[in-house]
Amino acid sequence: MAKLISADLTNNKLCILEYTTDFGQMLSVNEDAFDAKIVSHTYTNIGKLIFDKPITKIGDSAFEFCINLTSVTIPDSVTTIGANAFEYCESLTSVTIPDSV
């Protein structure tokens, strides 16, 4: 499972800059690779999720296996939530989903 090392949230974009794999390998991603999207396995050890910058899509399996995640507030800017985006989030007890989804 990948773990986020750094991300850039400027200009209303989420850009994943670096992440590690299960094998400890650090990978870099072009900072323009993702435009306001959350991609697979971006975060793995979070408890509460509130987006303060506009995003448009939460990708497939984006928060899969976030076993400590208890609360998610999705902003109105989101129009798509991918398959299995919150699969195996066993502690998730509160989700706020806007009408835009």
Question: What does each model-found stretch correspond to?
Answer:
Residues D22-E64:
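LRR flanking "cap" motifs
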Residues G59-A62, G82-E87:
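Consensus positions within tandem repeat domains that build extended binding/scaffold surfaces
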Residues A7, N11-N12, E18, T44-T56, ...:
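Structural signature of tandem-repeat unit edges
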Residues M1-A7:
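Enriched but not universal
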